[in-house]
């Protein structure tokens, strides 16, 4: 009788362990994706966007066009391109060294955002510096997605190494960055 009870207990424990082993671990968050937000460091994404092949190609083409205009004596075209490039550089500085919005970079990713959101299990993306937007989401509903967005820009290896420094650095306050940029010190 004692043997039967021990055998019954052993079989019961084994069956319980086997059923438990076949259950998938629940790593999935309990919050539905629509209620979760993917947060990203806009400075890092802006840097990746700047160094992406299409952006570097565009910059080379604009510089070549400026050079051609200058050589042809077309001062108006040269001045317009120079102003455009200056504004682009200023915008980039405010995005990379501070917390300015990165609308152009996110627009480039627009077609991929639904797939990236599904991959991350989030309903939307918000800059980690956008405190007003983040107030709508509790801490446990925030998912870090910076690296997920950055990988879309397919950075060259030297630029990838620079990203870690940006992640650790504290951004300049936007007003201070604007002042430094206007003074040519950013």
Per-range role (PLM):
Residues 21-186:
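Amphipathic, charged alpha-helical segments and their helix-to-coil junctions
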Residues 16-20:
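Sec/Tat signal peptide C-region and signal peptidase I cleavage site
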Residues 1-4:
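Positively charged n-region of N-terminal signal peptides that target proteins for export
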Residues 7-15:
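Bacterial N-terminal signal peptides
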């Amino acid at each position: 009788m004692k043997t039967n009870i021990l055998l019954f207990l052993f079989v019961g424990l084994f069956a319980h362990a086997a059923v438990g082993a076949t259950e998938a671990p629940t790593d999935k968050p309990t919050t539905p994706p629509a209620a979760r937000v993917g947060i990203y460091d806009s400075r890092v994404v802006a840097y990746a966007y700047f160094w992406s092949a299409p952006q570097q190609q565009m910059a080379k083409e604009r510089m070549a066009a400026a050079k051609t205009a200058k050589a042809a004596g077309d001062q108006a075209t040269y001045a317009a391109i120079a102003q455009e490039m200056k504004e682009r550089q200023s915008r980039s500085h405010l995005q990379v060294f501070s917390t300015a919005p990165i609308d152009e970079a996110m627009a480039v990713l627009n077609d991929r955002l639904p797939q990236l959101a599904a991959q991350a299990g989030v309903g939307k993306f918000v800059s980690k510096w956008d405190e007003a937007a983040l107030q709508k989401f509790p801490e446990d509903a925030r998912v870090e997605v910076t690296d997920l967005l950055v990988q879309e820009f397919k950075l060259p290896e030297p630029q990838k190494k620079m990203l870690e420094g940006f992640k650790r650095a504290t951004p300049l306050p936007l007003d201070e960055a604007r002042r430094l940029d206007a003074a040519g010190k950013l």
